[in-house]
Structures are given as structure tokens and as C-alpha cells.
Amino acid sequence: MSGGAGIPDVPAFDASGVRLAIVASTWHTKICDALLAGARNTAADSGIDNPTVVRVLGAIEIPVVAQELTRNHDAVVALGVVIRGETPHFDYVCDVVTQGLTRVSLDSSTPVANGVLTTNSEEQALNRAGLPTSDEDKGAQATAAALTTALTLRELRAES
């Protein structure tokens, strides 16, 4: 289910001191480019003008690149799209990417926001890509999640 139901309002925040990286796949270029644009816009609105951006071919490559990026960044955003086809490949890819990103985040204690769309159709992906005709912008949402989590972790670590 999607369409904007339940999406929290995220107040403006200053993340200007956060080192942000974005890794985005290139399959389904129109969708991935739109996700990346939304991520860049949210970063800029939060005080980050030049996040590190790395493009990879497909979704399966995202976790290992995200892992490397956590070494020198405070937050990482993963962007891509996997659209269900006629074979079980969709399920395998989605599972590997989701588990990989979660493991990277937990192992590195660095927020890695999962903005990899997993949809049943191209139409669903387009509707979440942040295009003018889209209901949602998952690139922007993932970036806000990564940055606000990085700020929360910074506060928690300062208290210890």
C-alpha cells in the first residue's frame, strides 16, 4: 500500500555537518534518476550541497558499495528499483538487497536508508519516484530518514 497514507511530516532540520553518501543503481534510468534528484534536493534543503554520489549497475551491487561508503560517511542512502518479473529472481534480489543494507547499517553503526523500490509494476515505481506525476518521493524520504537518524545518533553519542 502506498499513495501517501501514513507518511510523517518531517520538520526542517539542519544536517550541514553530516557527511552524506548516496549510492544509486542505473537500471530503470528514469526512475533512478528521479529518486536521485529527490535525494539531492532533500540533502540541499538540509544544508548538504555536495553529497558523495556513486552509481552502480544494479540493485545487488548497492550493499557492498554502501558498506564501503560507511567508512567515511555519517549516513548513506541506497536508491534503486526492482520490478517483479515472471521468475522468482525478484524475490531473491529484494531479499539480498534488504538484508545486505540492514547488515551494513547494523555492522557499521551508520544509518543506511533503504530507498530501493520493490514494486509489482513499473507504474508503481514511477508513482514513488518523485516525478511531477508521482504521489511519493522515496528518494527524498530515504534521505530524510538517513539524515535525521545520523543526527539522532550524533546526539546519543554526545550524551555518552
From Swiss-Prot:
<feature type="active site" description="Proton donor">
    <location>
        <position position="89"/>
    </location>
</feature>
<feature type="binding site">
    <location>
        <begin position="81"/>
        <end position="83"/>
    </location>
    <ligand>
        <name>5-amino-6-(D-ribitylamino)uracil</name>
    </ligand>
</feature>
<comment type="pathway">
    <text>Cofactor biosynthesis; riboflavin biosynthesis; riboflavin from 2-hydroxy-3-oxobutyl phosphate and 5-amino-6-(D-ribitylamino)uracil: step 1/2.</text>
</comment>
<dbReference type="InterPro" id="IPR036467">
    <property type="entry name" value="LS/RS_sf"/>
</dbReference>
<dbReference type="GO" id="GO:0000906">
    <property type="term" value="F:6,7-dimethyl-8-ribityllumazine synthase activity"/>
</dbReference>
<dbReference type="InterPro" id="IPR002180">
    <property type="entry name" value="LS/RS"/>
</dbReference>
<feature type="binding site">
    <location>
        <position position="114"/>
    </location>
    <ligand>
        <name>5-amino-6-(D-ribitylamino)uracil</name>
    </ligand>
</feature>
<dbReference type="GO" id="GO:0009349">
    <property type="term" value="C:riboflavin synthase complex"/>
</dbReference>
<feature type="binding site">
    <location>
        <begin position="59"/>
        <end position="61"/>
    </location>
    <ligand>
        <name>5-amino-6-(D-ribitylamino)uracil</name>
    </ligand>
</feature>
<dbReference type="GO" id="GO:0005829">
    <property type="term" value="C:cytosol"/>
</dbReference>
<dbReference type="InterPro" id="IPR034964">
    <property type="entry name" value="LS"/>
</dbReference>
<protein>
    <recommendedName>
        <fullName>6,7-dimethyl-8-ribityllumazine synthase</fullName>
        <ecNumber>2.5.1.78</ecNumber>
    </recommendedName>
</protein>
<feature type="binding site">
    <location>
        <position position="128"/>
    </location>
    <ligand>
        <name>(2S)-2-hydroxy-3-oxobutyl phosphate</name>
    </ligand>
</feature>
<comment type="function">
    <text>Catalyzes the formation of 6,7-dimethyl-8-ribityllumazine by condensation of 5-amino-6-(D-ribitylamino)uracil with 3,4-dihydroxy-2-butanone 4-phosphate. This is the penultimate step in the biosynthesis of riboflavin.</text>
</comment>
<feature type="binding site">
    <location>
        <position position="27"/>
    </location>
    <ligand>
        <name>5-amino-6-(D-ribitylamino)uracil</name>
    </ligand>
</feature>
<comment type="subunit">
    <text>Homopentamer.</text>
</comment>
<keyword id="KW-0808">Transferase</keyword>
<feature type="binding site">
    <location>
        <begin position="86"/>
        <end position="87"/>
    </location>
    <ligand>
        <name>(2S)-2-hydroxy-3-oxobutyl phosphate</name>
    </ligand>
</feature>
<dbReference type="Pfam" id="PF00885">
    <property type="entry name" value="DMRL_synthase"/>
</dbReference>
<comment type="similarity">
    <text>Belongs to the DMRL synthase family.</text>
</comment>
<dbReference type="GO" id="GO:0009231">
    <property type="term" value="P:riboflavin biosynthetic process"/>
</dbReference>
<keyword id="KW-0686">Riboflavin biosynthesis</keyword>
